[in-house]
UniProtKB/Swiss-Prot annotation:
GO terms for molecular function: copper ion binding; dopamine beta-monooxygenase activity; L-ascorbic acid binding. It is found in: Cytoplasmic vesicle, Secretory vesicle membrane; Cytoplasmic vesicle, Secretory vesicle, Chromaffin granule membrane. One of its GO terms (biological process) is norepinephrine biosynthetic process. Residues 1-9 are cytoplasmic. This is Dopamine beta-hydroxylase. The keyword Disulfide bond applies. The lineage of its organism: Eukaryota, Metazoa, Chordata, Craniata, Vertebrata. It catalyses: dopamine + 2 L-ascorbate + O2 = (R)-noradrenaline + 2 monodehydro-L-ascorbate radical + H2O. Homotetramer; composed of two disulfide-linked dimers. It comes from Equus caballus (Horse). It is a single-pass type II membrane protein.
Amino acid sequence: MKVPSPSVREAASMYGTAVAIFLVILVAALQGSEPPESPFPYRIPLDPEGTLELSWNVSYVQETIHFQLLVRELKAGVLFGMSDRGELENADLVVLWTDGDSAYFGDAWSDQKGWIHLDAQQDYQLLRAQRTPEGLSLLFKRPFGTCDPKDYLIEDGTVHLVYGILEEPFWSLEAINTSALHTGLQRVQLLKPNVSVPALPADMRTMEVRAPDVLVPGQETTYWCYITELPDGFPRHHIVMYEPIVTEGNEALVHHMEVFQCAAEFESFPQFNGPCDSKMKPSRLNYCRNVLAAWALGAKAFYYPEEAGLAFGGAGSSRFLRLEVHYHNPLKIEGRRDSSGIRLYYTATLRRFDAGIMELGLVYTPVMAIPPQETAFVLTGYCTDKCTQLALPPSGIHIFASQLHTHLTGRKVVTVLARDGREREVVNRDDHYSPHFQEIRMLKKVVSVHPGDVLITSCTYNTEDRKLATVGGFGILEEMCVNYVHYYPQTQLELCKSAVDPGFLQKYFHFVNRFNGEEVCTCPQASVPEQFATVPWNSFNRQVLSALYGFAPISMHCNRSSAVRFQGDWNLQPLPEIISKLEEPTPRCPASRGRSPAGPTVVDIGGGKG
């Protein structure tokens, strides 16, 4: 259908009071299938001002998401959508806009220059537009996958949501360019696992670990650290659940929070309450790294399986806890107070199993490096069959949650389980991973790991903005590739990671010298980062390094909780032999789509259907 287009002068004359009144009285103008009976369990603010709020629920049976978008201060329209990394270009969008006479709701997309186009396949279905005391509420749905090349495939991992505010009418959807709008992005996991809530113990108690009335700095990013401690003589307990406590009014400010337990070998830790990067922060706080709880925007309460709990308190456990809160304050608001934190639910009735946390992936070492100017360079770390055979109990372990972690150049992380040389299943995968959005995620399905299994963790990096090689290490400009898996029963195996054998890396430096006129320093006193810094990064040297990581022996770290390796020969270990890999997931098209509209849905001023 052709959308009517009044003249520019007519549109301008209609703008103002008429547009505002028209959009405010938009009440139930559209009729469609009713939303599911279940409420909207997930809710996030989209913009820092809190004028846009998104709620949603997930139907795995229908493979559909129902969205509810609340627009508190509607001007001339709004756009919402998804893109690969949060760009407004090449985005999958749904737009509510007005031309001055009528309003339209339509599935759209933006091109590489930010111009918006109506999608020929209308996959966003508007179910209801309703004025509420809070603002205009838009209820619509969309399948996970549509098989429309202009649409975003909604997957299990991180989704980069984008939004835009239309402040004036547009005579046509094609007249809108995202660069002229007030826009932004928000990261979230849309496809939350449908995990049933386990029974909770009758003697359950709570403990709140909260920031003590923090005056949030008026800068875009702040990591705030606060040290607290358990009561004297606090006995051993099991954490069975935790949930966020966000100060009312700060929902758009608190991005993520973590509670760490400090190292038991220190009898005391100094008190601290301030920015984590402060020069006044005691260095001993760097030994508070054992994660007890982690929450990120959009996440709900985290439950441990009925048969397991995370132990804390008692002998051999530190009394000291560190709370870390990430404040995201792009508007640089001054004077805001915050007492957000995490509420721990714990029981003195210990469950059958202690839960454990194991590190998978790559060792923090500069021998694993990413050349500069790479768009998708892959590094892989192994937890080998030799290590799991030695360190896991005969009945194996059961992974129920996972937290992926890289530094700034990480773009994708996946861990797969292999058995008898064949990849069997994915433990966790995030194809749109962002280092700015990290949370402990419940797995849809518990993954059982048997002695002799292999766990393979691969990270994909983008270093297009780097001039030198990015080496592995603890620094924020260095890189990591880690999956912290949460499992039960707890074992002595705390770290199962690898890195290329250092001797073979030196052979790489000597080898590329033959083709580069001794440009790479291989002198004994040169460090590995210094050697990488002198490599001329032509295509040959890049390919050889990638090939080296794909065949060279590895140094295996099969470590106990005491940071001591299990007994055995762990150097110059061959890479696990994988004879069969999992196929890449194939998007599923909706079985029956029904009749989608040929164009946008039109709503006239009187509330009738267009």
